[in-house]
Amino acid sequence: MDNYEILETIHKSKTGETIVFKVKEKNKKTCDKVYALKLIGELNNRFQKLMFKREVDALKTLNSCNGIVKIRDYVLNAEFDGKNDCGLILLDYVGGTNLEEVELNQFSQIEKYELCLKIFKAIEEAHNNNVLHRDIKPSNIMYNVETKEVKIIDFGTSKIKSIVEQETTLPFYSQNFSAPEVVKGNSTTEASDIYSLGAVMFFVLFNMLPNGTKMICKTMDDLGTTEILKNLISKMVAEEPENRFQELAPVIDIVEDLIGDNKPQKDTYLCSVDIKKVELFKENFINRK
């Protein structure tokens, strides 16, 4: 991808194995289009390269999904900063603010529900395409305050990173938002993503970091949360995967109901009209004239 110019570094992992740059095409002075270029490497053997390609190809199937950042291209065997055989992924650059930095206390309750609904629908589309995120957390959710658009980033790349990171003894999970089975090093499933979404919903609604199932449930009890909301989040973040929702469709239905219940209702008045009395009134009015 020599035809792209690096504008700035957006992110660099602690090990330095993953770097994200903001880039633009060279020799296109009139074009303001920018992209995100993710470098992952080195891919030291055939197995790592095969897994990298398989994962990126799977993620490209999400390009038609709403709310998910799109992959434009990728390269194997790239050279960067003295490293050979690096993997490069070119993605759409997503503006806005990540959810970790959004002023959620400025949102109304219904706006918070609508935000969660957009996130859930994006992840549902991915699940319907047999792709898991594996690292759902506020910093991987971008929000545009003006357009209210939501974009999920870093989609599925936690598995790619786990293939190439040198410090393989480090667990790949996010504090506060990963499911218990993921923290223990077990396989990620749809139920694991649903746990993370429940933790994100708790973060959005209550503006505090979740810290495990017990803390989430106790906080909701202490705050007098409504039964429907408490039951929803509690089931999403259940300790055991089998006790959670196994798909997002029922979660989305409940959130849509919550939005409907919280929307201000316009007053509607029903009345019946006696036509004979109306005609009599008209006659009396005319006679008075």
Residue ranges, per PLM feature:
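Conserved HxN/HPN-centered segment at the entrance to the catalytic loop
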Residues: S64-L76
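AlphaC helix of the eukaryotic protein kinase fold
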Residues: N44-T61
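Conserved short submotifs of the Hanks-type protein kinase catalytic core
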Residues: G82-T97
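Activation segment signature within eukaryotic-like protein kinase domains
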Residues: L115-C116
